[in-house]
């Protein structure tokens, strides 16, 4: 199991095996094996430091078949935690885009550019994440088709030429451990 040990000054990620777990304490075994556990101390942490398990969450868009036939699919935002079965979070999410704010100069006060994941030159320079979602209504409404195109963080989609209502949502998340 992977854990994060952190206080306000230091952070360390390590692998360990719980050997005694009660309601108030967990003892961690530190047997050394290739690529998993530490062979040296990980540093001096302040009082109040926290040890928490690493949680891996994957977010993705997947079609949900409501009934047979292509007209009956519904795109939705799903999440899978630590490889578990995915759960549907939000129905109608057609597009999910992420761009990463890069601090080229290293002063950690400004974002010099936003890039896609495959263009991140150094993940240590990422100081923010820009997210965009295009969400559609579950049902078609009215008589007019949607002739619009939508710019989801630089990816232009549409026109869809259906009668669904759509909204574009964007937000920027600052990574607090990366900024001053």
Predicted features and spans:
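Short linear sequence signals and composition-biased patches located at protein termini or domain-edge surfaces
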Residues: 47-180
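Extended Gly/Ser/Thr-rich low-complexity repeat segments
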Residues: 1-4, 36-55
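A structural detector for beta-sheet-dominated domains
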Residues: 6, 17, 29-31, 62, ...
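Ser/Thr/Gly-rich low-complexity blocks that favor extended beta-strand/coil architectures
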Residues: 1-23
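Short coil/turn segments at the loop-to-beta-strand junctions that recur within blades
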Residues: 34-36, 84
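Short, solvent-exposed secondary-structure boundary/capping segments
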Residues: 20-34, 102
């Amino acid at each position: 199991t992977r854990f994060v040990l952190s206080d306000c000054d230091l952070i360390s990620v390590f692998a360990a095996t719980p050997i005694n777990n009660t309601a108030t304490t967990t003892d961690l075994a530190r047997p050394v094996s290739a690529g998993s556990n530490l062979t040296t101390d990980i540093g001096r942490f302040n009082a109040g430091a926290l040890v928490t398990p690493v949680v891996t969450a994957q977010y993705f868009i997947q079609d949900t078949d409501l009934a047979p036939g292509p007209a009956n699919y519904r795109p939705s935002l799903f999440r899978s935690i630590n490889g578990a079965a995915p759960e549907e979070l939000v129905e109608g999410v057609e597009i999910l885009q992420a761009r990463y704010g890069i601090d080229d100069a290293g002063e950690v006060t400004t974002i010099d550019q936003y890039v896609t994941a495959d263009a991140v030159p150094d993940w240590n320079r990422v100081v923010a994440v820009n997210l965009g979602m295009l969400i559609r209504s579950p049902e078609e409404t009215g008589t007019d088709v949607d002739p619009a195109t939508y710019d989801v963080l630089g990816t232009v989609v549409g026109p869809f030429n259906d009668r669904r209502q759509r909204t574009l949502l964007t937000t920027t998340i600052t990574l607090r451990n990366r900024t001053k």
